[in-house]
Regions:
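Short helix/strand-capping turn motifs
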Residues: 1-122
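Short linear, low-complexity motifs centered on an aromatic residue
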Residues: 132-140
Length: 140
């Protein structure tokens, strides 16, 4: 079964940790408040509970060509635990399995640029530097 499709000009935020509903709601509220325009398609589906990168890559590779998405942002235990809600960005297309973290503060910029193909996943992943967390260009 393919991953859920994000709404037009948004990216998919997929919940994989179901241990704290209040934390998920706080993350969704932070996403809603991070930008004037909707930039996320949040999905809370228990079938993705504990899903790892390899499982998501397998699901996506089984999808039809017109159902594939290029990246997904995971709301895993790490994202739900911290006040910055550092989502795990996962490349599903160019370098499948490549990841970096992105605090919600930076998510709207990344989502917008990826959804219109203004920038690509690798540019953000490269800018994440040794910490593995994107905090803007040249600020890590």
């Amino acid at each position: 079964m393919p991953l859920p499709q994000p709404h037009d000009l948004t990216t998919l935020v997929l919940r994989t940790d179901f241990g704290d509903d209040a934390a998920w709601e706080a993350l969704c509220a932070a996403l809603d408040g991070a930008d004037a325009y909707p930039c996320a398609t949040p999905v809370s589906d228990p079938r993705f509970a504990g899903a790892g990168i390899q499982a998501l890559l397998a699901e996506e590779s089984a999808a039809g060509e017109d159902e594939r998405i290029c990246e997904v942002f995971l709301a895993d235990a790490t994202a739900l635990a911290g006040p910055e809600h550092p989502l795990l960005a996962v490349d599903l297309f160019t370098e499948p399995g490549r990841t970096f973290r992105v605090p919600v503060r930076w998510y709207p910029e990344i989502s917008a640029n990826l959804s219109i193909a203004n920038m690509d996943f690798a540019e953000y992943a490269d800018a994440a530097g040794p910490s593995g967390t994107f905090r803007g260009f040249g600020d890590d």
